């Protein structure tokens, strides 16, 4: 039986980033995933500056940033009014491109086996891992990074606790101008009314395409979902009638991808020799935009802090594993992610006085910041003025308020 230091179960973003980071440490590492090339998968499609900062702490990821498209500037709008033009900090990249690019960063010292982890027999010293090929490998540590797949966790005696079923739904599609080119580099347009159950649509470049992510709070069997899938342009126009005042006429030329988000956390995780990261431990709401940051935080703390400590001494008991889950940096980000998931939902759809006040406060705050930035641009002549046409008129209406 082959003996190694670390086996990683799952080669999505969490597993591939972990493998790339550990491959530079000298620890004998094996990554197990059935896909030779990671297939198309509608998940995270951009990274913001905070996520990039954590990614860079892992020591890997520069290739991902080179493969991504930086937006340069992002416009913010609501009710058909341009509120703010802020510096862009988001890198657009499709999830499968991100994962496959990260895999290209895995050094040859990491052995990649195209199979599935079927079972893990744990102990306080070494773990016996059984693969779908029948091969068995002995590892000091098993990193479970297999995302939403619960079979292995159930075999390990862990349980999934649901927090919020179908907490939100993300719809992804390309948006193209039906006429003149889009005048904005990137755009976030917020939902117009709580009854629309829509947080926002964000438009951002991925290569030559303008990608759209629409975030809604509905059930999968809501007739509106089928309506959007069948007639996306008309349904989007009815949902956000003011959007075209910013974008101009648009069309949705291709397929609409739909991804519901169930919020859950895995319990009973403090087992010897096995640690969970990313969605294997808990999920996040894509509307809140914290999922990728949570993955990178898990990987950074695990690879930079805990694994070096664990491998420096004999054994791999549950007390070592517990230290990772109790890590203050990691715990703080997980708490932030969970809090933001419910905060954004309440700000979007709750109709109580305090929530209505928060929505309007955010609206006027963005408008005020936008006016100050525009005044600074005009005074310093350091940035271009707002484009002409419908966008110019929308900004002018906002500025007069």
Model-predicted regions and their roles:
Residues 1-14:
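Beta1/beta-strand and adjacent pyrophosphate-binding region of the FAD-binding site
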Residues 14, 37, 149:
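Conserved Rossmann-like nucleotide-cofactor binding loop
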């Amino acid at each position: 039986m082959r003996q190694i230091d670390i086996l990683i179960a799952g080669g999505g973003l969490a597993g591939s980033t972990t493998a790339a980071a550990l491959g530079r440490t000298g620890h004998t590492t094996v990554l197990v995933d059935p896909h030779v090339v990671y297939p198309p998968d509608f998940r995270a499609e951009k990274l913001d500056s905070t996520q990039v900062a954590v990614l860079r702490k892992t020591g890997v990821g520069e290739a991902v940033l080179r493969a991504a498209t930086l937006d340069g500037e992002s416009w913010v709008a609501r009710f058909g009014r341009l509120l703010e033009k802020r510096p862009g900090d988001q890198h657009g990249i499709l999830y499968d491109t991100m994962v496959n690019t990260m895999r290209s960063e895995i050094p040859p010292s990491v052995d990649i086996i195209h199979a599935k982890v079927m079972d893990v027999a744990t102990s306080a010293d070494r773990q016996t891992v059984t693969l779908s090929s029948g091969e068995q490998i002995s590892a000091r540590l098993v990193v479970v990074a297999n995302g939403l797949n619960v079979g292995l966790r159930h075999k390990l005696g862990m349980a999934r606790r649901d927090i919020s079923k179908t907490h939100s739904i993300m719809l992804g599609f390309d948006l193209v101008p039906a006429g003149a080119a889009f005048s904005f580099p990137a755009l976030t347009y917020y939902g117009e009314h709580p009854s629309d159950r829509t947080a926002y649509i964000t438009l951002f470049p991925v290569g030559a395409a303008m990608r759209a992510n629409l975030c809604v709070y509905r059930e999968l069997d809501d007739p509106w979902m089928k309506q959007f899938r069948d007639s996306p342009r008309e349904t989007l126009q009815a949902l956000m009638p003011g959007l075209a005042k910013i974008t101009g006429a648009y069309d949705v030329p291709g397929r609409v991808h739909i991804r519901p988000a169930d919020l859950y956390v895995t319990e009973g995780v403090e087992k010897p020799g096995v640690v969970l990261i990313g969605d294997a431990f808990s999920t996040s709401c894509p509307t809140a935009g914290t999922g990728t940051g949570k993955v990178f935080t898990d990987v950074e703390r695990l690879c930079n802090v805990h694994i070096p400590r664990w491998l420096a001494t004999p054994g791999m008991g549950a007390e070592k594993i517990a230290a990772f889950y109790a890590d203050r940096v990691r715990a703080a980000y997980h708490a932030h992610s969970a809090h933001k998931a419910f905060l954004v939902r309440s700000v979007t759809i709750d109709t109580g006085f305090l929530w209505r006040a928060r929505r309007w406060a955010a609206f006027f705050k963005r408008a005020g910041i936008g006016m100050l930035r525009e005044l600074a641009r005009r005074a310093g002549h350091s940035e271009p003025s707002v484009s002409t046409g419908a966008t110019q008129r929308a900004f002018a209406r906002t500025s007069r308020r």
